[in-house]
Amino acid sequence: MTTHDIYERLRERIDSYSIGMNATGNGKELAILKRLFTEEEARYYLALTRALEPAAVIAGRLGVSAAEAEKVLERMCAKGHLFPKTADGVKLYAAAPFMHGFFEHQVYRKDRDPELPRLIEDYLMGGFIPKSRALRVVPVGVGLPDRKQVLPYDDVRGIIMSKERIGLMHCACNHHMKSLGHECGQDTEVCIAFDFYAEYPIEQGFGRWIRREEALKVVERAAERGLVHQAGGDSRNVECICNCCSDCCGILRMLKRVPNAGRFLSSNYTPAFDAGACTSCGECAERCPMGAITVGDGVELNADRCIGCGVCAVGCPAGAVTMQKKPDDLVRRPPSPEKYTFMRSSIDFRADQEAAKGKG
């Protein structure tokens, strides 16, 4: 097998995970992989799955000893290729997809290849096509109707209050853009993760445990600062709440380039403007991350561009913006497990760990 074949097979495997890593025809994706993986590491990745497994199982697929496999797998963990975990003293490994996975992990590496950010940026903005939705917009709490009428999966406060294990980390997208010389001026410690996705960054040294009260303050300040709440997870479990600025977030930056962003990413709410209360100050238009609002004699909303984040409602000094629930036939519910691939559920990772107990 030639070097090109190895890396193309690696790309194909990564493309089958999460939102993929499509071929561009210009080789940008292969340039990234060659910077990230040695040929040996590429072969090891091809022997892994998204499920957590012990080194002995992976070694069996490769025809090497468990000790030899563990040595390479640990090196790959240090490079951000894998999700590691331990069960009953047995180290387990799972393949990390491009996103959410080794893209984010690279950001926090102190020994990161200095050429990598530019290569990744060129790929993201010059050919990357996500295979499926990654996150969903959750509206801010301001301007919503009676909280009792808000669906549980649209309630940021409710999601946080339902969680026991909460982690906070610096925004990977913000760090990525900083490495390219772009400073947006926003808060950076704004990404909240739960369960497995909180444990991993904290174990790797780039996150910290927080209480619910601090998490609530993070999302409240994020909303005030004009950041968009985006949640990840399937219908069983919310895995994270990212608080994103449209200058840095890869998803929002890509959507800003299309005229109908709301078709691809939107909450279950849409802003309504009270013409009597509105002073035409323009604050809502200035805050809108998608440029969906224009203000003249009144306020005009481009519904195709609106993602229903509610940032306009938070910033309105006159309180003239409320968030109205969309008709039931337009409501998007969190996807079922078989239809959501961006973040493998903490529930499934926990099942892997339980299955591995007693096998060491």
Task: Spell out what each predicted region is.
Residues V90-G126:
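Short, amphipathic alpha-helical interaction segments positioned at domain boundaries
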Residues L62-A78:
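Short amphipathic alpha-helical interaction segments
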Residues A303-G360:
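Flanking helices and flexible, charged tails adjoining ferredoxin-like Fe-S electron-transfer domains
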Residues M1-L30:
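Long, low-complexity, charged/polar intrinsically disordered regions in eukaryotic proteins
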Residues A51-L62:
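Short acidic, hydrophobic short linear motifs in intrinsically disordered regions
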Residues A95, Q230-V238, V258-G308, T322, ...:
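Ferredoxin-like iron-sulfur electron-transfer modules
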Residues C77-D88, I293-T294, V321-T322:
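A short, conserved structural fragment
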Residues L116, L124-T270:
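Catalytic cores of enzyme domains
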